[in-house]
Regions:
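Low-complexity, acidic/polar, glycine-enriched regions of mature
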Residues: 1-185
Length: 185
């Protein structure tokens, strides 16, 4: 994207969303989000962009407190013992409108490769003079690969919670000062 400037950008949590969707009872989809997301994306003059993102597991929100409490428990994320999810990119392949971003996703100390399809949404300067870039991304993974194995069998067959997790990310990032770019490199 010709509008995207090189440098290191930090996620703007007020203008970014990390959402997920999982089948419930094999017939409906439950959606949720994580409210506490931090990280950086570095866009070099040449070569591949890199990403390093952390998500606070306790910030999970499905709009149902009882379900959120269960998701924070040892049955799922065990937020007391494993307070963060982390994604670190390992490779980026250019596509027509963005990137295939390959990386390592770590949940509960289990790391597995995940691929995100990233679309460049635009770049600009906000009213306060901050350089911004925006990306959207989608991906999926099997939750049981990360030790998120709790489930309950249904009388008619099947299970309560689906294994496939679909991710949807909308991120706005703000360019960091040049001195910070050098420190991050």
């Amino acid at each position: 994207m010709s509008n995207v400037l090189t440098g290191t950008y930090a996620i703007d949590p007020a203008h970014s969303n990390v959402e997920f969707a999982v089948k419930h009872m094999m017939i409906t989809t439950v959606k949720g989000r994580f409210g506490d997301v931090k990280g950086t994306i570095t866009i070099p003059e040449k070569g591949e962009p890199t990403a390093d993102v952390t998500i606070a597991t306790a910030s999970i929100d499905t709009r149902t407190e009882a379900r959120d409490t269960h998701l924070r428990s040892a049955d799922f994320f065990d937020v007391e013992k494993f307070p963060q999810i982390r994604f670190v990119s390992t490779k980026a392949d250019r596509t027509d409108d963005g990137w295939k971003l390959l990386g390592n996703l770590t949940i509960k100390e289990t790391t597995r490769p995940v691929t995100l399809t990233v679309t460049e949404e635009g770049a600009g300067v906000d009213p306060w003079g901050n350089q911004k870039v925006a990306f959207s991304a989608i991906g999926k993974f099997n939750r049981t690969d990360f030790g998120l194995t709790w489930n309950a069998a249904l009388e008619a067959g099947g299970v309560l919670v689906g294994e496939e997790v679909k991710l949807s990310i909308d991120a706005q990032l703000v360019k960091q000062a040049a001195a910070q770019d050098k420190v991050a490199a």
